[in-house]
Regions:
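Conserved PLP-enzyme active-site core in the AAT-like
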Residues: 1-100
């Protein structure tokens, strides 16, 4: 009714997927989630989190807000490089049952 975006706190997203057996799509955009703060830190990564925009209507505005707030890191590529290994061979799901 008010067209507010629905945000999902994904700090333990991998744990929830592993525990329930549902697909990431079922848990997020198919359930109406517009944005997820995808956390990998609590599942074995070092300081690696990402904002995933599932609804393109919010993409451009969010990018501008992030820049205005100063949330751009000059060496972010080193932090985000962890995600390549994290998603390879479903490592993120294999680690999830052992996360906090």
């Amino acid at each position: 009714r008010h067209k507010l975006p629905l945000h999902m706190d994904g700090a333990r997203f991998a744990n929830a997927i592993a525990a329930t057996g549902v697909s990431p799509a079922e848990m997020t955009w198919k359930s109406g989630v517009d944005l997820i703060s995808f956390g990998a830190t609590k599942n074995g990564c070092w300081m690696a989190d990402a904002v995933v925009i599932l609804n393109p209507d919010f993409g451009k505005e969010l990018r501008l807000l992030r820049q205005r707030a100063g949330q751009t890191f000059s060496k972010a590529r080193f932090i985000s490089a962890q995600f390549e290994a994290y998603f390879t061979d479903e490592l993120w799901l294999r680690m999830a049952p052992h996360g906090n």
